[in-house]
């Protein structure tokens, strides 16, 4: 299909932030290890996937567990392209299971407790995962309710839209199409400092 992002390209693009972060700290020159350690990575977004992929390549005997409840992995920069009609919604996501690096155990649960003194992570089902090293890449959650007059439920209804999430980007494109058809005056705003 023309315009589709391949799985390989998708994972490469969504892992760019993690790769840049590692490069900035000398990560590209890191040497591998034969130590048998347990590593838990909390968060399966671009950073969590990128770090997990890097660790599984460098640490041949490590047990790497990635914890994230999401079914889908989103290429979030693509949300702007959905909102402008360049991409279709199906072009910015993949099944999370297809993005987990080979050799990494995926736990599809939400984290409910971190106990650094005990080196453990507890998930929603009650299972406790011990670790030698913990990597936290949980991502963010937009707090729309902190903006007077907005809520996650009402955003995208009426004339206020955002491309900061998957559903919002689709609503934005529908609103742009309606605006082009009807005409009128459009007001676009951006925050002084990014909230994501």
Region roles according to the model:
Residues 17, 141-142:
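Active-site beta-alpha loop architecture of Rossmann-like, nucleotide-cofactor-dependent enzymes
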Residues 14, 125, 138-139:
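Glycine-rich, N-terminal phosphate-binding loop of Rossmann-like dinucleotide-binding domains
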């Amino acid at each position: 299909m023309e315009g589709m992002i391949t799985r390989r390209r998708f994972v490469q693009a969504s892992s760019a932030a993690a790769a840049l972060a590692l490069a900035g700290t000398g990560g590209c020159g890191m040497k591998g290890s034969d130590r048998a350690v347990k590593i838990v990575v909390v968060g399966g977004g671009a950073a969590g996937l990128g770090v997990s992929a890097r660790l599984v390549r460098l640490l041949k005997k490590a047990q790497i567990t990635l914890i994230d409840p999401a079914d889908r992995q989103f290429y979030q920069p693509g949300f702007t392209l959905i909102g402008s009609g360049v991409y279709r919604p199906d072009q910015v996501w993949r099944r999370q299971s297809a993005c987990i690096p080979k050799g990494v155990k995926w736990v599809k649960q939400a984290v409910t407790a971190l106990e650094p003194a005990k080196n453990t992570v507890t998930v929603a089902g009650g299972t406790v995962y011990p670790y030698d090293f913990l990597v936290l890449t949980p991502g963010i959650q937009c707090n729309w309710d902190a903006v007077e007059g907005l809520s996650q439920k009402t955003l995208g209804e009426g004339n206020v839209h955002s491309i900061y999430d998957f559903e919002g980007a689709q609503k934005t494109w529908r609103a742009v199409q309606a605006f082009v058809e009807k005409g009128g005056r459009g007001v676009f705003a951006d925050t002084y400092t990014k909230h994501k």
